[in-house]
Amino acid sequence: MFQPSPWRADFPAIAALQRQHQTYLDSAATTQKPQALLDALSHYYGHGAANVHRAQHLPGALATQAFETSRDKVAAWLNAADSRQIVFTHGATSALNLLAYGLEHRLEAGDEIAISALEHHANLLPWQQLAHRRNLHLVVLPLDAHGRIDQDQALQLIGPRTRVLAISQLSNVLGTWQPLPALLAHARAQGALTVVDGAQGVVHGRQDMQQLGCDFYVFSSHKLYGPDGVGVLYGRAQALELLRHWQFGGEMVQLAEYHSASFRPAPLGFEAGTPPIAGVIGLGATLDYLASLDAHAVAAHEASLHQHLLRGLGDREGVRVLGAPQTALASFVIEGVHNADIAHLLTEQGIAVRAGHHCAMPLLKGLGLEGAIRVSLGLYNDSDDVQRFFDALDQGLELLR
């Protein structure tokens, strides 16, 4: 039975891709953009662009107002207590590096940083390199058979020497939600700061920072149907005060002398130089669009398509799905077939999926794999997209076997 997407027409690129005989199933890498975002970018550039927080002239005042209004919208979307808890960066990777450098002064030799075995490189490498610089111990929390952090083992490994716990909310490879409430509460009890990589999780349902209770939460705009080049760092007010400035330049400074300077607090103190103004304004427009949708209908649509995807993969001989995916994506391997070969055949048939290690090399290596195919869904996908994928997969398997 055909399952349409009520929001498909809101994304003009989907129709353009269809005219190119392309089926887009790579939304965990980046999403297509709604018309509301395109309109906001066109309006900003077409009605007078200007820098923010600098000038008294009308274009500058209007740009600053729009920029700060977007900060308010992000704070509301995350249910942050105050918009000053929202720092704009150039991506989730940038935000995580900010945290690793900004917290470095608080760590000393022998301290521990805990991450999980499923982390994206963006939430692995900044902490790994910090551990090298400061002679710290990087503790890797193991997974259970379903692809979730093994809670019992994690609670044993997070101890009094743990200074930072940095974990993903939703795995970009396994599609599994992680047991954040128990892990965050335990880490807080041990005196550790908590960092949540929400790059995937923020896309699926509203995330409530006051309820979640982490110290820091990061995500990228482009995975949330917003523009690229924009990241968000949320921080508890007390946690933001612990960060040391790590990038220096225009507008983050309070007073500059030739031999000394004082710096602004968050958020502006961590937004050195010209920020991604158009992107931030565009993110605000995207959040307005998303807020206008029926959240229950979106969740039901994604869940139904995801079940269709999982059933179809499970019905095909030799196909093994990694872990126990819960939301919007599935990674799989095929017995006796290299992932690059099947990816090539899918690409030739106009199916846009991801193949490889998905920026999580240690995870794939731990699973004994060189790579996998990942199919990931967006709110614009419909059941015909999934069926076209299955038809192409079946043709590819017939050729390769």
Swiss-Prot record:
Looking at the keywords, is Transferase present? yes
- UniProt entry keywords in alphabetical sequence: Pyridoxal phosphate, Transferase
Q: Which GO terms describe its molecular function?
A: cysteine desulfurase activity; pyridoxal phosphate binding
List the InterPro entries hit by this protein, alphabetically.
Answer: Aminotrans_V_dom, Aminotrans_V_PyrdxlP_BS, Cys_dSase_SufS, PyrdxlP-dep_Trfase, PyrdxlP-dep_Trfase_major, PyrdxlP-dep_Trfase_small
Which family does the record claim for this protein? Belongs to the class-V pyridoxal-phosphate-dependent aminotransferase family. Csd subfamily.
Could you tell me which residues carry N6-(pyridoxal phosphate)lysine? 223
Which top EC class applies here? transferase
Q: Which domain of life is it from?
A: Bacteria
Q: Which reaction does it catalyse?
A: (sulfur carrier)-H + L-cysteine = (sulfur carrier)-SH + L-alanine
**Functional description taken from the UniProt entry:** Catalyzes the removal of elemental sulfur and selenium atoms from L-cysteine, L-cystine, L-selenocysteine, and L-selenocystine to produce L-alanine.
> Taxonomic lineage of this organism?
Bacteria, Pseudomonadati, Pseudomonadota, Gammaproteobacteria, Pseudomonadales
Q: List this protein's GO terms for biological process.
A: cysteine metabolic process
Q: What is its EC number?
A: 2.8.1.7
The record's annotation in Gene3D superfamilies points to: Aspartate Aminotransferase, domain 1 (3.90.1150.10), Type I PLP-dependent aspartate aminotransferase-like (Major domain) (3.40.640.10)
| Name this polypeptide is given | Probable cysteine desulfurase
Q: Which cofactor does it need?
A: pyridoxal 5'-phosphate
